[in-house]
Amino acid sequence: MYQKYTEDLAPVLHATQLALPIATVAPSWTPVCFGSMYTGVSPDVHGIKGYVKPVITVDSLFDSLPRSGKKVALVTVAKSSMAMVYLNREIDYYIEEYDDAVTEKALELIQKDQYDLIVVYNQEYDDMIHRTQPESPEAMAAFHHHIDAFDRLTKCVKANWADHDAMVVWASDHGNHMNDQDHGAHGEDCPRDINVMHYYGIYPKKHP
């Protein structure tokens, strides 16, 4: 997507300074990937090796930050992997019906500036590739919805978090490929599923 739709990603590139190629873990199922992304350990260690959503019990970012006195919010879609595998942490959960409500809640939290970390999860593109194909009109519309949401979120950070240093991250959990049924899929150890891009933006504190 980065190579083929670079111009479409202009708002993301404008909001960040680093685009980093990442190889996600295998099997590239959503709960497996998020299990490793927020713990830093392999699936063998965090315990999720397929499309299942148990609560992860090993130490994670959602444990270490509260332990260090940081306040964390997780804003995500109901019944998603992110809404389930990191439950029972000392963080604030905002479980919303779908992406639009997630983004609006995240914007509200950014404006209040009461958290050290806000993790925001949207899922429309993944839903659309499974229902259709990776570059179908429906999937591409979802892709652009995610870009627009990130653009709004990062602009909100710039407007409301100028009193302290801030970082924004766009972090995909996996890629996807076309399966034998002509639908988008993932979960295999293949380049299209494993190779993704993460984008990092640093916003220094504005001094008087």
Model-found features: residue ranges?
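Feature captures the catalytic ectodomains and active-site-proximal regions of enzymes
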Residues: M1-P208
